[in-house]
Regions:
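Preference for intrinsically disordered or flexible, low-complexity segments
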Residues: 1-318
């Protein structure tokens, strides 16, 4: 669980790591943080519709990447709270400094709600699993897409046993398995779709703070980098005759600044190189490059008019 207590220091960072887990531990009733598989929807009503889950560039359905369970203490309406990240699987949609192929959805519930018990879930595997049939959500009865686990009301016209979010996923399922199974009594209730990312649990632990010695080493390293840069500038004076002076200065400044940011990123993640999520509600991102860092004006306000704040970042490619 990612803690979202506003009383904590904004600088505190919680790291997320991948870990294998039993499938039942990644169900909605366990309030999981996880990567891949189908979404473990928190609220079982009011789910995003198909247009909201499409890539804004190619208009194809996006795939579920990960979700973070991050309740906010002290607020009953967000006693349960999950953030779900979806991404497009079309490589051509990923262009520099453009987030239109990724979307985040927030879902939250009070402690007393119609879907889950008031008390925390037990640590043992339940005797019965109401989520074992992944075609429909329990309680609400919302039908789900067989391929991606998102809301889907488009049924197979032949067997009427499976539903899809749209024609794209219906064709995908037909091509890979349903063509052989349609109308058969052997149609399985659970399937691993080729559309999904591998499913693993996202376990967390606080990031250890750097001690004074490490900070001094960092400053020393940065000083050495600056010294090296100065020496490099001296060595490259002979090239200044063939390159325009302004171009040379711009290149040097850009490369030096970008290298410092990248070195700072590498130093920060070096103690835990397998981290995949950095959570720090109200904190700051750990930038990998000095280029294309958004300004306050670049970050749109919430629909309520409030300023948006940083909450978490994904630091490795899945």
């Amino acid at each position: 669980m990612m803690s979202s207590d506003r009383g904590e220091s904004p600088a505190e960072v919680v790291l997320g790591f991948l870990e294998e887990a039993e499938p039942w531990r990644l169900r909605s009733a366990q309030f999981p943080s996880k990567v891949g598989g189908k979404p473990a929807w928190l609220s079982l009503r009011g789910l995003p519709c198909l247009p909201e889950l499409e890539c804004d560039r190619c208009r194809l359905p996006m795939a579920f990447l990960l979700q973070v369970y991050a309740p906010i203490s002290g607020q009953d309406w967000s006693f349960h709270r999950s953030l779900l990240l979806f991404c497009c699987k079309t490589p051509e949609c990923y262009t520099l400094n453009d987030s239109s192929c990724m979307k985040v959805f927030r879902s939250q519930l009070p402690r007393r709600n119609e879907f889950y018990p008031y008390d925390p879930p037990p640590e043992e595997e339940p005797l019965s699993d109401p989520e074992s049939d992944q075609r429909v959500l329990p309680v609400s009865g919302v039908k789900l897409c067989w391929v991606c686990g998102c809301p889907g009301n488009k049924g197979c016209s032949r067997c009427h046993t499976v539903t899809y979010c749209g024609k794209n996923h219906q064709m995908l399922h037909w091509k890979h398995t349903h063509k052989k199974e349609c109308g058969s009594q052997e149609v399985s209730l659970v399937t691993t779709s080729v559309f999904l990312f591998p499913e693993t649990e996202l376990v967390t632990e606080p990031e250890e703070e750097e001690d004074d010695g490490k900070e001094e080493d960092t400053k020393k390293d940065e000083g050495e980098e600056e010294g090296s840069t100065t020496k490099t500038d001296e060595d490259c004076l002979s090239l200044a005759e063939t390159l325009a002076e302004t171009d040379l200065e711009e290149m040097a400044m850009c490369e030096t600044k970008d290298m410092k940011v990248f070195q700072r990123f590498k130093k920060r993640i070096a103690p835990e190189p397998h981290q995949v999520v950095r959570y720090s509600r109200g904190g700051s991102p750990l930038w990998v490059s000095s280029q294309h860092i958004p300004s306050d004006q670049d970050i749109p306000q919430c629909t309520c008019g409030a300023e948006r704040t940083f909450e978490f970042q994904v630091v490795t490619a899945q």
